[in-house]
Amino acid sequence: PAYEGPVIHVLDASRAVGVASRLLSDTQRDEFVETTAAEYTKVRAAREGKGQSVLLSLDEARANFFDAYLSDKAAPPLQPGVHAFDDWDLAELRDYIDWTPFFRAWELHGNYPAILTDDVVGETARQLFDDANAMLDRIIAEKWLVAKGVAGFWPCARDGDDVTIHRVNREEHVVLPFLRQQVKKSRDRANMCLADFIDPAGDWIGGFAVGIHGLEPYLARFKDDKDDYSDILLKALADRFAEAFAERLHQHVRTDLWGYAPQEQLTNEALIKEQYRGIRPAPGYPACPDHSLKPILFDLLDAEANTGITLTENFAMYPTAAVSGFYFGHPEAEYFGVARIGRDQLEDYARRRGVDMATAERWLRPNLD
């Protein structure tokens, strides 16, 4: 191999900051790398001793689709089209922060607010929480950061595992190819695909992108001051703001822009628990594992012009404190993981995406093991 250093698999982006800080630490790095390597050895051994799950053929999986009550689909949006937001109020977004992932980013495990009184990590968590809120006070009062976002809604229809969007103003169609679960299910459980939540006879789908801008001058100052703690703290808070913005914008979509839940009144705790109608799956996450759908989404939203968010050649977003995804409004829409797929679906997906097999394999590598 060309690289022989440590490789750490981070399941949740919110934990990346904490992992990176431990890898950079003179006092923690060696123990962390050794412990992780030992854990990975156990994982490999456990995987080798475990039988592979049974896959259905793609035709069998499609025959076992999720049969949604399409008569319950969301009404057309009250405000269709694309809506840009140049500077969402950070003070409002502060109230929508989910603090549990923030603590996990620092390798402090426990749910907020209980973690603040935890017998083991409570004291450390309280100090970190106080520092975070002190920095939040400055971020908001001194306008360190800017929250930019965009949301859009388009008429569409399901066509198999694809969702075809009709761009009326351009007289063109845009196809969103989604993947279907192929692992054999227990009785009465469907092999789900996001397209199952869309009516073939006509429906609506939405999309969004939000980003937090303005970190660079403060990170540069922290670097000059050799203040690693503040550097990591600001990055972690920017990530929390991005997620809070995604949550708040989705709420605005449900109650006002799309308006299929105008009477919704939920606490932040209820929002965090997703006790509302609709989902916002993101490209690169379990229900929609292909990151390469981001350019299609960004084109629909004109996201770069409307938010300043750009995509790298490997579909990562910049600034890194950013979130994007699709909106599904059907009341039965739910999150799920596509998990492992077969060669037949890979070939079908490559055809639907218009790419060669090698490219499709690269995009979907985690789902082929």
Predicted features, each with a name:
Residues A2-P6:
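Short, structured coil segments at secondary-structure junctions
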Residues V7-L11, F336-G337:
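Alpha-helix capping and helix-loop boundary segments enriched in small/acidic/polar residues
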Residues L11-I232, A236, L257, L266:
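Active-site loops and adjacent core secondary-structure elements that bind or stabilize anionic groups
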Residues R189-D369:
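C-terminal accessory domains/tails appended to large, multi-domain proteins
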